């Protein structure tokens, strides 16, 4: 048993969307609203070409976050195995925050998903994780193990008050702490400090992958 039947049985009839009332409601779809080109031309595009609120990580997994209406803050929804699961999570949050004016990734999200009664970040995060889990069998490839852990997603679903672009610079800043980190590691393992030349400028050459840190 999968998809919506499992979803309904797991969480009950209360999971029907409050926006589904009224037969004349036609949701706005992301596929009919092309995205604007990313303003950052220097970096690789990570946004999904169609789905709203979905970005790809280097690991191949997909993350989702939504901006709160009339604010610069975002609600983090978690990390997912597939773009479709992340897109479902987005739809839950979009419906909770914007109602019928929400731009959805899937038209049936308006009536298949439970919309939390409050706009509290924790309530939205929980509903988003549950929706992604319920649609896992439908969206994933037909394999024996889809590798999705709802508990892990719920743990990762933490609220962030920063714009998503800041995440890149956080990782970039961590790069400059590597010399002291290696020194601490060497001291802890009673090994000599590796002789690596660190260049403290803002340009990192990604071609130096064959640098050896320790020589045995």
Swiss-Prot record:
Short motif Nuclear localization signal, span: 35-47
InterPro entries named in the record: AP2/ERF_dom, AP2/ERF_dom_sf, DNA-bd_dom_sf, DRE1A-I
DNA-binding region positions on the chain: 50-107
Domain of life: Eukaryota
Keywords annotated in UniProt: Activator, DNA-binding, Nucleus, Stress response, Transcription, Transcription regulation
GO terms under biological process: cold acclimation; positive regulation of gene expression; response to cold; response to water deprivation
Molecular function GO labels: cis-regulatory region sequence-specific DNA binding; DNA-binding transcription factor activity; transcription cis-regulatory region binding
Compartments (UniProt record): Nucleus
Function comment: Transcriptional activator that binds specifically to the DNA sequence 5'-[AG]CCGAC-3'. Binding to the C-repeat/DRE element mediates cold-inducible transcription. CBF/DREB1 factors play a key role in freezing tolerance and cold acclimation.
Protein name, entry field: Dehydration-responsive element-binding protein 1A
Natural source organism: Arabidopsis thaliana (Mouse-ear cress)
């Amino acid at each position: 048993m999968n998809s919506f039947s499992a979803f309904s049985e797991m969480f009950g009839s209360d999971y029907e969307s409050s926006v589904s009332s009224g037969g004349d409601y036609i949701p706005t779809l992301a596929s009919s609203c092309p995205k604007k080109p990313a303003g950052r031309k220097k970096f690789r595009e990570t946004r999904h070409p169609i789905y709203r609120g979905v970005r790809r990580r280097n690991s191949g997994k997909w993350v989702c976050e939504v901006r709160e209406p009339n604010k610069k803050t975002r609600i983090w929804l978690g990390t997912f195995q597939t773009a479709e699961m992340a897109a479902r999570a987005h739809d839950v949050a979009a419906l909770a925050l914007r109602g019928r004016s929400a731009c959805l990734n899937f038209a049936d999200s308006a009536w298949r998903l439970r919309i939390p009664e409050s706009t509290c970040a924790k309530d939205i995060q929980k509903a988003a994780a549950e929706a992604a889990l319920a649609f896992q069998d439908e969206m994933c490839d037909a394999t024996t193990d889809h590798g999705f852990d709802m508990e892990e997603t719920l743990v990762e679903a933490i609220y962030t008050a920063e714009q998503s672009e800041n995440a890149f610079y956080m990782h970039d800043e961590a790069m400059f702490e590597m010399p002291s980190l290696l020194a601490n590691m060497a001291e802890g393992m009673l090994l000599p400090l590796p002789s690596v030349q660190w260049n403290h400028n803002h340009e990192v050459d990604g071609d130096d992958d064959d640098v050896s840190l320790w020589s045995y």
